[in-house]
């Protein structure tokens, strides 16, 4: 039985910091970001099904979100202003991501590749799945901005403004619900969110 470096590579996602050009009060790595995106994507899928007559698989969407940035273990986290500087760079970076995704899939033992390929390669996502993961990704970036701003770090003001436009473009009923029900708490301190339910 041959060895696979797949999970050894994925474990290094925690070494890749997000927002590399920004001063951060608290650094965020790709591994923890992926977990938060998975939780939010799962919630969006549940909300879509329960409140807005959706028919998506929340558990699959959580898994897709968990792996959505896995290729960054090979490419690094390219800053957004660089990634989207122009359409040519954006196109080439997408091609690089695709190569990285295929390289990761090739690391998986052949008898398991049919399970992992649809998680790592977004071309296997349905439109609903892709939309929910992208919404969750943008929401989590927005939440990071709120956390930094609430800690007094104005470095994230423009990023917050840019992400508000992104969220408006990716708007959905389930996102509106999430924004109204869950996001306001991110403006509060620990004392404020725990005062109604002390341990």
From Swiss-Prot:
Ranges of residues in domain HD? 30-142
List residue numbers at the site (Appears to be important in orienting the phosphate for catalysis): 18
According to the record, the segments passing through the membrane are none
Q: Which InterPro entries match?
A: HD/PDEase_dom (IPR003607), HD_domain (IPR006674), YfbR (IPR022971), YfbR/HDDC2 (IPR039356)
Q: Which cofactor does it need?
A: a divalent metal cation
Q: Which GO terms describe its molecular function?
A: 5'-deoxynucleotidase activity; metal ion binding; nucleotide binding
SUPFAM superfamilies, sorted: HD-domain/PDEase-like
EC numbers, comma separated:
3.1.3.89
An example GO CC term for this entry is: cytoplasm
Q: Which residues bind substrate?
A: 18-19, 33, 69, 77-80, 137
Q: Please write the reaction equations for the catalytic activity of this protein.
A: a 2'-deoxyribonucleoside 5'-phosphate + H2O = a 2'-deoxyribonucleoside + phosphate
Known role: Catalyzes the strictly specific dephosphorylation of 2'-deoxyribonucleoside 5'-monophosphates.
Regarding protein family, the annotation reads: Belongs to the 5DNU family.
Protein's UniProt name: 5'-deoxynucleotidase ESA_00928
Q: What is the originating organism of this protein?
A: Cronobacter sakazakii (strain ATCC BAA-894)
What taxonomic lineage is listed for the species of origin? Answer: Bacteria, Pseudomonadati, Pseudomonadota, Gammaproteobacteria, Enterobacterales
């Amino acid at each position: 039985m041959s060895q696979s470096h797949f999970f050894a590579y994925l474990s290094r996602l925690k070494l890749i910091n997000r927002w590399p050009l920004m001063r951060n009060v608290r650094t965020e790595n790709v591994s923890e970001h992926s977990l938060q995106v998975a939780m939010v994507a799962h919630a969006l899928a549940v909300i879509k099904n329960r409140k807005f007559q959706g028919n998506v698989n929340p558990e699959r969407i959580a898994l897709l979100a968990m792996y959505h940035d896995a290729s960054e273990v090979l490419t690094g986290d390219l800053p957004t202003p660089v990634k989207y500087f122009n359409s040519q760079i954006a196109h080439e970076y997408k091609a690089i991501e695709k190569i990285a995704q295929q390289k990761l899939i090739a690391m998986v033992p052949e008898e398991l590749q049919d399970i992992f390929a649809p998680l790592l390669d977004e071309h296997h996502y349905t439109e609903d799945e892709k939309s929910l993961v992208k919404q969750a990704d943008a929401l989590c970036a927005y939440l990071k901005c709120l956390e930094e701003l609430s800690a007094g770090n104005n470095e994230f003001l423009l990023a917050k403004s840019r992400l508000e436009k992104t969220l408006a473009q990716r708007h959905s009923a389930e996102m509106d619900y999430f924004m109204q029900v869950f996001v306001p708490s991110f403006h509060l301190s620990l004392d404020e969110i725990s005062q109604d339910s002390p341990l």
